[in-house]
């Protein structure tokens, strides 16, 4: 299985395991559309702080879900949680639909975040265990890139639905889009097998062999994962251990840029419709609801550049030095936002501002959004890899939560211009940290295409 060509079973595993990434991005996009609708239907409207708190609720759930379900799945097996997570997302989304109230929206977003966080803790393992050696890095990247489909599909669907319904009170119906994705996720996993890597780690090589044959066919023999040590024989490495013996540079190199990227992906991503209206990029409309529809339409167009960004990044994965890709990605993101800022301040034509926004999304996803995901497994040893990647991801989610929490406050304090300036500064910081620490931590000769948790 390590050297075989790709076949249908490989693509099936990638498609099924990628649904969590797709649904997570879809939920983030949906929250950014629902929040301005709530501002219309609620009296009094939400404060800037309340908007930020509601917006980051699902991200907090993702952080907790990744830790909790990740730990439980290590003990109980991946498959049960691979099915439980979409059930949780489905139940929480239906709760929001039937209650249509702010407290239950917050509860539902948190529960949906828990389920999606569980997905994030499992998807890359399933993919990397099944893929041939030369395709591991690429296919884990493809799973990450699938999140772009969630951004695009939900934004487009919301635009067409809102244009038909023409009523801001229907915001809760939009959550059924997440219900639909959860149903698809669940149905694709009814007939599925346990993780071969988990079975090997728990001393079940015969069952692992059967799982591999289920996924790839009866003619396939199990590969290098059979040589993994049993879980009880592996050295224990905690986050404190990563700060000893000169490992601090690794933590800075993987953690700080991921946190900086989180502001762009989630802070700007979640509040894109709000930011578009604050920048005056939507067409002049008579009512606030029509302005929301116009902003969602432009959000859809901008989101279309997320997918080409990921594709560009995947094409560069095995060709460019990863530190260079991430550094230039941050710099070009900042340049795109600088164009957007100049267009806003100088009242330049709208198309110039939109080009800046699209450039930001293109290079964000070609560089930092993809690279921060695949760099941690390359710089940590097998014993440190799980803890190292987990700590880097925690930095990323903290950056995302901070971004979503503070974007509405920045809009209140200094308008869209302040949001853009802060975001440019954060991305320049990400470029600086990557450039300074990257060459020391990850020399060119040490790049290893094995993005997995062992």
What residues fall within each predicted segment?
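Transmembrane-helix signature of 12-pass secondary carriers
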Residues: 1-454
């Amino acid at each position: 299985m390590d050297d075989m060509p790709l076949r249908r079973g490989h693509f099936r595993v990638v498609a099924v395991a990628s649904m969590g990434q797709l649904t997570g991005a879809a939920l983030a996009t949906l929250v950014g559309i629902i929040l301005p609708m709530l501002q219309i239907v609620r009296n009094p409207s939400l404060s800037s702080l309340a908007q930020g708190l509601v917006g980051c609720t699902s991200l907090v759930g993702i952080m907790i879900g990744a830790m909790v379900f990740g730990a439980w799945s290590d003990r109980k097996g991946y498959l049960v949680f691979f099915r439980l997570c979409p059930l949780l997302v489905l139940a929480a989304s239906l709760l929001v639909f039937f209650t249509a109230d702010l407290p239950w929206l917050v509860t539902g977003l948190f529960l949906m975040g828990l389920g999606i966080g569980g997905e994030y803790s499992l998807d890359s393992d399933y993919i990397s265990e099944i893929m041939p050696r030369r395709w591991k890095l690429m296919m884990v990247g493809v799973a990450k890139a699938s999140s772009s489909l969630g951004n695009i599909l939900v934004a487009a669907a919301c635009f067409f639905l809102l244009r038909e319904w023409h009523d801001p009170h229907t915001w809760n119906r939009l959550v059924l889009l997440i219900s639909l994705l959860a149903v698809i996720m669940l149905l694709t996993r009814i007939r599925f097998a346990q993780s071969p890597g988990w079975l090997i780690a728990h001393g079940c090589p015969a069952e692992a062999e059967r799982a591999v044959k289920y996924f790839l066919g009866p003619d396939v023999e199990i590969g290098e994962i059979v040589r993994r040590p049993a879980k009880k024989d592996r050295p224990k490495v905690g986050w404190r251990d990563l700060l000893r013996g000169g490992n601090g540079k690794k933590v800075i190199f993987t953690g700080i840029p991921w946190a900086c990227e989180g502001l762009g992906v989630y802070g700007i991503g979640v509040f894109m419709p709000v930011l578009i209206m604050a920048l005056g990029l939507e067409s002049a409309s008579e009512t606030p609801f029509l302005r929301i529809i116009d902003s969602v339409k432009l959000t859809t167009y901008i989101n279309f550049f997320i997918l080409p960004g990921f594709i560009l990044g995947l094409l560069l994965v095995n060709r460019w030095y990863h530190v260079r890709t991430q550094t230039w990605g941050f710099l070009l993101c900042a340049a795109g936002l600088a164009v957007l800022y100049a267009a806003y301040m100088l009242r330049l034509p709208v198309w110039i501002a939109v080009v800046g926004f699209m450039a930001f999304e293109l290079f964000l996803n070609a560089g930092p959004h993809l690279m921060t995901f695949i760099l941690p497994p390359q710089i940590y040893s097998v014993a440190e890899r799980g803890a190292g990647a987990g700590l880097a991801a925690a930095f990323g989610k903290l950056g995302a939560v901070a971004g979503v929490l503070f974007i509405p406050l920045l809009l209140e304090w200094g308008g869209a211009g302040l949001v853009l300036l802060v975001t440019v500064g954060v991305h320049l910081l990400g470029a600086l940290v990557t450039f300074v620490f990257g060459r020391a931590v990850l020399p060119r000769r040490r790049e290893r295409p094995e993005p997995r948790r062992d």
